[in-house]
From Swiss-Prot:
Keywords: Cell inner membrane, Cell membrane, Membrane, Transmembrane, Transmembrane helix. One of its GO terms (molecular function) is succinate dehydrogenase activity. This is Fumarate reductase subunit D. The lineage of its organism: Bacteria, Pseudomonadati, Pseudomonadota, Gammaproteobacteria, Vibrionales. The chain crosses the membrane at residues 30-50, 60-80, 105-125. GO terms for cellular component: fumarate reductase complex; plasma membrane. InterPro entries: Fumarate_red_D, SQR/QFR_C/D. Its main location: membrane.
Amino acid sequence: MKPNYNVDRAPKRSDEPVWWSLFGAGGTWFAMITPVTVLVLGILVPMGVINAEALSYDRVVSFATSIIGALFIIATLALPMWHAMHRVHHGMHDLKFHTGVVGKIACYAIAGLISALAVVFIFML
């Protein structure tokens, strides 16, 4: 007996899981890590709650050149950018700006460029 439905044996593969994973990682990072970073660097240190000597130039450079520090800085710059550009790409579609593949490539190329620049700048330290 033959089934009544056809199974597509070579389904079209989508690249959306890649973009959605970067979108999700960027959103999570932006929601959980960025507020703490802003609190510490933008409020607590200037108010004197945290000693400014703790963030002296030498200590910051040694942190930024360590593997953990470099990954933290790269993730802080790159992941929210992937999140934002994914939102821009889908927001343009929602606003009826159907840019197709060109818009997709432009949005994700900008996020990739910012990510690459973050890596380059870390290696320049």
